[in-house]
C-alpha cells in the first residue's frame, strides 16, 4: 500500500509518500508559509498557498510529478493530542474529526492545524481512507500514580489536567527497534529511551509499554529543551504574574525563550557544543544543566522500570551529538554505565550499541522514523477497516 503521511502545522505541511510493503520513501516535501505568502522547500520549489486546501493541491501536483499515476491507498495524519479517548490509531470519519477538534484546548498550537489537514484531505479525496496516529497514544498505559498530579481532584475531573506525554510514536518505534537489536521480545524490553531534539522527552519502558514519561499536560514539562524550560517551580509563574507578566508573556518565555536558548543564547545543540569547546562559559553551563537534568531522569526511570535493560538515545541530538551523549554517560557512573569513546564518536545511520562490554547495561543509538511508524500504522488500520 502507498501511504501519504501528513504532518500539518498551522503554517506548514510536511508530506511523505511511502511504499509500506517495500519500506521505501517514494517522495517527500515541505510546504511552508501557508497563508503567509511564498515559500516552500520540498522536491521542488513550491509557491506558498493561501490555505491548507491549496497546499494540498500543490502536494498532489508534486506527487504526480514524481510518481505519475500511482494511486495512494490511504493517508496517515500525525495528530499531537489524543486526550484520554484515543489509545491507538483510528480510521477517521466526521465524528472522529469532531472529537479531535474538541481536544484543541489541550494542544492549541497543534491540534487545530492537524484538523485543518484532515478536513483538506476530506474535501479533496472524500473516499480516501484517513487514519489519525496520536503522539499521546503510546502513553495511555501509564499507571495512575504516574499520570496524576498532586492537585485537587476537580482539576482532573473538570479540566482534564493530568500527564499525557508526547513523542509517543517515536518512543514506541524506537522501543521495538531497540528490542530487536538486543534480540529481546518487545514484551521483555525494559528500558529508558531519550528522544532528544529541539523538543526532548524521556520515557520509561517496561514490558514494551510506557510507564512514565517526562512531558506532561503539555510538551513543556520535563527536560531542558531547545527553547523550552522543562521543569521549574510553579511559584515562579505566580511571582512573575504578580510582577506584571501576562499569561501570554509567560507562555512565550517558557516555550520560545528558555531552555538552551535561555541559558546559552542559542537553541542549536551543535552551536552550543562548539561554543563550549571554544571556552564559552555560558555554553558550558547550559550543557551542564541540560545533561544533569537528563541524567537525573535516567536514574529515576531506571528505578521506575525495576532495572533497565538498556539506555537508548534517539532523535536529532540523541542520534548525532556524540559529545552530549558522552556528557550524559559521564554522570551515570552510579548505574554502571560505560560508553566506548570510539563507538560513541563513530557516525552511522544504523541502530547500534555504543557501550563497552563492561557496561552494566547496554547503551544504544537508534534512529527514529516517525513517518515510517505512521505509515505502517495507517496501512494496518486502513487495511482492517477499524
Swiss-Prot record:
Cofactor list: Mg(2+); Mn(2+)
Catalytic activity, EC: 2.7.2.1
Gene Ontology cellular-component annotations: cytoplasm
Full protein name: Acetate kinase
GO molecular function annotation: acetate kinase activity; ATP binding; magnesium ion binding
Residues noted as binding Mg(2+) in the record, renumbered to the chain: 7, 370
Protein family per UniProt: Belongs to the acetokinase family.
Record-annotated site: Transition state stabilizer: 167, 228
Pfam families reported in the protein's UniProt record: Acetate_kinase
One GO term (biological process): acetyl-CoA biosynthetic process
Biological pathway: Metabolic intermediate biosynthesis; acetyl-CoA biosynthesis; acetyl-CoA from acetate: step 1/2
Keywords annotated in UniProt: ATP-binding, Cytoplasm, Kinase, Magnesium, Metal-binding, Nucleotide-binding, Transferase
Enzymatic reactions: acetate + ATP = acetyl phosphate + ADP
Subcellular location: Cytoplasm
Class of enzymatic activity (EC top level): transferase
Cofactor binding notes: Mg(2+). Can also accept Mn(2+).
Main location: cytoplasm
Binding site for substrate: 78
Binding residues for ATP: 14, 195-199, 268-270, 316-320
Amino acid at each position: 500500500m502507498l501511504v501519504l503521511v501528513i504532518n500539518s502545522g498551522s503554517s506548514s505541511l510536511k508530506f511523505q509518500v511511502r511504499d509500506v510493503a517495500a519500506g521505501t520513501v517514494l517522495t517527500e516535501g515541505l510546504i511552508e508559509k501557508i497563508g503567509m505568502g511564498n515559500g516552500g522547500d520540498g522536491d521542488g520549489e513550491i509557491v506558498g498557498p493561501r490555505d491548507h486546501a491549496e497546499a494540498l493541491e500543490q502536494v498532489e501536483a508534486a506527487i504526480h510529478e514524481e510518481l505519475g499515476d500511482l494511486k495512494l491507498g490511504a493517508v496517515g495524519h500525525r495528530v499531537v493530542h489524543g486526550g484520554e479517548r484515543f489509545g491507538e490509531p483510528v480510521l477517521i470519519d466526521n465524528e472522529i474529526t469532531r472529537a479531535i477538534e474538541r481536544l484543541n484546548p489541550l494542544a492549541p498550537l497543534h491540534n487545530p492545524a492537524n484538523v485543518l489537514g484532515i478536513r483538506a484531505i476530506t474535501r479533496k479525496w472524500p473516499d480516501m481512507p484517513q487514519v489519525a496516529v496520536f503522539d499521546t497514544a503510546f502513553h495511555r498505559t501509564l499507571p495512575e500514580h504516574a499520570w496524576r498530579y498532586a492537585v485537587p481532584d476537580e482539576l482532573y475531573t473538570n479540566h482534564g489536567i493530568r500527564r499525557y506525554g508526547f513523542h509517543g510514536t517515536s518512543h514506541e518505534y524506537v522501543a521495538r527497534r531497540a528490542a530487536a537489536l538486543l534480540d529481546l521480545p518487545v514484551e521483555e524490553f525494559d528500558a529508558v529511551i531519550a528522544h532528544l531534539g529541539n523538543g526532548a522527552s524521556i520515557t520509561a519502558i517496561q514490558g514494551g509499554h510506557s510507564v512514565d514519561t517526562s512531558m506532561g499536560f503539555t510538551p513543556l514539562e520535563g527536560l531542558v529543551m531547545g527553547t523550552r524550560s522543562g521543569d521549574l517551580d510553579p511559584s515562579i509563574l505566580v511571582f512573575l504574574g504578580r510582577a506584571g507578566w501576562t499569561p501570554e508573556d509567560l507562555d512565550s518565555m517558557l516555550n520560545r525563550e528558555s531552555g538552551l536558548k535561555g541559558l546559552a543564547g542559542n537553541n542549536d545543540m551543535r552551536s552550543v557544543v562548539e561554543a563550549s569547546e571554544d571556552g564559552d562559559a555560558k555554553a558550558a553551563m547550559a550543557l551542564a544543566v541540560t545533561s544533569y537534568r537528563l541524567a537525573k531522569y535516567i536514574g529515576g526511570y531506571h528505578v521506575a522500570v525495576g532495572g533497565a535493560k538498556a539506555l537508548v538515545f534517539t532523535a536529532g541530538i540523541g542520534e548525532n551529538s556524540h559529545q552530549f551523549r558522552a556528557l550524559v554517560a559521564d554522570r551515570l557512573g552510579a548505574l554502571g554505565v560505560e560508553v566506548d569513546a570510539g563507538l560513541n564518536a563513530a557516525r552511522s545511520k544504523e541502530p547500534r550499541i555504543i557501550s563497552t562490554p563492561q557496561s552494566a547495561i547496554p547503551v544504544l543509538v537508534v534512529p527514529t522514523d516517525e513517518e515510517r511508524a505512521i505509515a505502517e500504522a495507517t496501512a494496518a488500520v486502513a487495511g482492517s477497516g477499524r
